Amino acid sequence: DSKEWLDAGYLNKTVKGQWNDDWNKAMSSESKVFAFLFPAWGIDFTLKPNWDGAEGDWAVTNPPQEYNWGGSYIQAATGTDNPEHVKDIILAMTGNQDNLLKISKEYSDFTNTKSGMKDAATNADFASDFLGGQNPFEYFAPVAENIKIAPLSAYDQGCVELIQNAFSDYFQGKVDFDKAKANFETAIQERYPEITEIQWPE
């Protein structure tokens, strides 16, 4: 559990949340941070731009628990000048295995092709220079098999953001657990007034 890790000294207490300057600096060569729990896209999108050291200093390993942290989506805008091309573009970006494998190879990102990711795991061409020649798909592909996708709703992303914000104060020792829960409930009801009750697991 995250609080146990924090209390044991496994987490860097100077990093106050995600997507901020502290977090970005924790990925630099000056940092003493040992590891980050990232989704596949975190390597190229987050870690690589913040790293100023040598290639090969980072690697991928199995996580303590399989999880899914969203993905990338493609949508067509109402009023596009090219409505006749929308379907073909979306299919090319989401359902064409050759295109998906190009994305995976260039960005070390896990894409929407189960058989393609399985093949990438055993293909040396998918090794990453940034990861010192490691093929991250050797880890991604088998771990992905165990991810359970819960039903998603229009509220999921907002709830994840708000629970991270509310419990950041708890992890930093500013509030107790019950206060963090209460702060989350307040934040949810402010953002989504139509949600009238929050049920916590027993």
Task: Describe each model-derived feature in a short phrase.
Residues 4-9, 26, 49, 54, ...:
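Structured segments of extracytoplasmic/periplasmic soluble domains
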Residues 44-53, 64-70, 75-165, 199-200:
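C-terminal lobe and pocket-closing loops
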Residues 1-49, 55, 84, 180:
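Extracytoplasmic ligand-binding clamshell segments of periplasmic binding protein
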Residues 34-39, 59-62, 74-76:
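Structural recognition of the beta-strand scaffold that forms the well-ordered cores
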Residues 4-7, 138-202:
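Conserved C-terminal helix/tail region of periplasmic/extracytoplasmic solute-binding proteins
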Residues 58-59, 145:
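Proteostasis/folding factors centered on peptidyl-prolyl cis-trans isomerases
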Residues 15, 19, 106-107, 180, ...:
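Flexible domain-boundary/linker segments
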Residues 1-2, 23, 41, 58, ...:
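Tryptophan-centric aromatic hotspots in well-structured domains and transmembrane helices
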